[in-house]
Amino acid sequence: MKYYFRYVEEIKPPLNGAMLRGLSVDKAANGHFLVKASNKVGMKTKDFIDLAVGQHDELADEVQLDVSKAESRDTVSRLSDLYHKTHGKNLVPKSEESIQVKLIGDMGMQVPVIGFVDLITEDDMIVDTKVRSQNRAIDLSRDIQLVTYSKITNINKIAIAQVVDTKEPKSDLIVHEVSELSISSVSQKIRSVSGAIRKRVFLPAPEGSWYCSKKWCFYWKICPYGESSK
């Protein structure tokens, strides 16, 4: 249903607090890896934090924050510091062209795919930067985005470089080797979803999904499977 509201009805959800914090850390990470691709070191911690906080402050007044601006800003500072000291230190970009790589391709079934890879490392690993508010179990073998990128680029190793805003902030690099079984499973999902979209059949999220809720879905109030169904 999110696809229907976003791309058929063209109702674009506004940037929220969590998205802003993620965007801010992501921008700093991109800047850091661009510098690191040329000097092998990257940005200093202070410069990394300043870039993330600057991005946050630039957009904060346009966003309906879930906490005060000062608290949101402090969170960005804390998480960007953690990201820089872990992923920023340990991950090495393949080249300057391996940051924010635009991909255009398909899964071999005439379903076009356009996307952006945050980072491709020197040891051929596709990395997606994530900022999360909760520590959730992640199964990358079922990640449609990253498995699709793996298929298009012929790079088998995928990863999520995440920082999690828990009481004690955590940094994790979750790595997975993509198998033919994963590619086949994701291809089948894409085939089913694209076929349904062409037939204008828009299904709800799986029952019990955390993202199908008032807290996490912008379309909750207008979705027939959201508030009106309760």
Predicted regions and their residues:
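Short amphipathic alpha-helical segments and their helix-coil junctions
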Residues: M1-P13, G54-A60, M125-I126, R191-F202
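Residue-level recognition of conserved beta-strand positions in structured domain cores
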Residues: Y7, D128-V131, Q162
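Short, charged/polar micro-motifs that form catalytic or ligand-binding hotspots
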Residues: I11-M19, Q134-L140, E207
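Hydrophobic (often cysteine-bearing) scaffold residues that line and stabilize catalytic clefts
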Residues: G17, R21, S68, S72, ...
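Metal-dependent nuclease catalytic regions and adjoining charged, substrate-binding loops involved
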Residues: M43-V53, D61, S72, V76-S80, ...
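Non-catalytic protein-protein interaction segments used by genome-maintenance enzymes to assemble
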Residues: Q100-I152
